[in-house]
């Protein structure tokens, strides 16, 4: 009984401290073509069920922008994921568009997936596989307006 209580306490402490689970795989996402150091780079990693609809804690991060590239690190269970990112240059916490829906900030999707007719790519087009040994993916920011 005492061993079960101690094992449960250790598991709870591991989760509380944010220590990655033993089965997690390292994922490195490099966002390149960052044109200025203004604002933040906002990145979310999705599974198929929440593609572009739900920002899940632990898979949604913001880092200060820096000219060139910004690198994000995650520890996630092996599986199929897709990522979306944007350069929140004005720091308002949202992806800005003009009245016609034209993007005013740089953005990118994993797997080099592109916007078609002002529609984001499908999960299948943007998805990649995270194997148990880990992976590195690069997302190339695209700016439709001057930076």
Where are the model-predicted features located?
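Exposed aromatic-hydrophobic patches
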Residues: 69-76
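Bacterial N-terminal signal peptides
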Residues: 8-18
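A short tyrosine-centered beta-strand micro-motif
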Residues: 79-85
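Beta-strand signatures of extracellular beta-sandwich domains
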Residues: 42-46, 84
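A short, amphipathic beta-strand motif
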Residues: 27-34
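Sec/Tat signal peptide C-region and signal peptidase I cleavage site
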Residues: 18-24
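Extracellular beta-sheet/turn segments enriched in Thr/Pro/Gly and aliphatic residues
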Residues: 106-146
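Acidic, glycine-anchored loop motifs typical of Ca2+
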Residues: 89-97
């Amino acid at each position: 009984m005492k061993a079960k209580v101690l094992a449960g306490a250790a598991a709870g402490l591991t989760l509380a401290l944010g220590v990655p689970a033993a089965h997690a795989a390292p994922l490195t996402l490099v966002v390149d073509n960052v044109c200025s150091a203004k604002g933040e780079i906002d990145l979310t990693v999705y599974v198929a069920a929440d593609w572009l609809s739900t920002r899940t804690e632990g898979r949604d991060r913001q880092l200060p922008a820096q000219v060139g590239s910004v690198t994000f690190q995650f520890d996630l269970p092996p599986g199929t994921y897709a990522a979306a990112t944007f350069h929140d240059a004005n720091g308002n916490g949202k992806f800005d568009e003009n009245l016609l829906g034209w993007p005013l900030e740089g953005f990118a999707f994993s797997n080099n997936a592109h916007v078609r007719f002002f529609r984001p790519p499908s999960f299948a087009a943007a998805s990649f596989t995270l194997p148990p040994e880990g992976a590195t993916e690069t997302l190339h920011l695209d700016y439709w307006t001057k930076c």
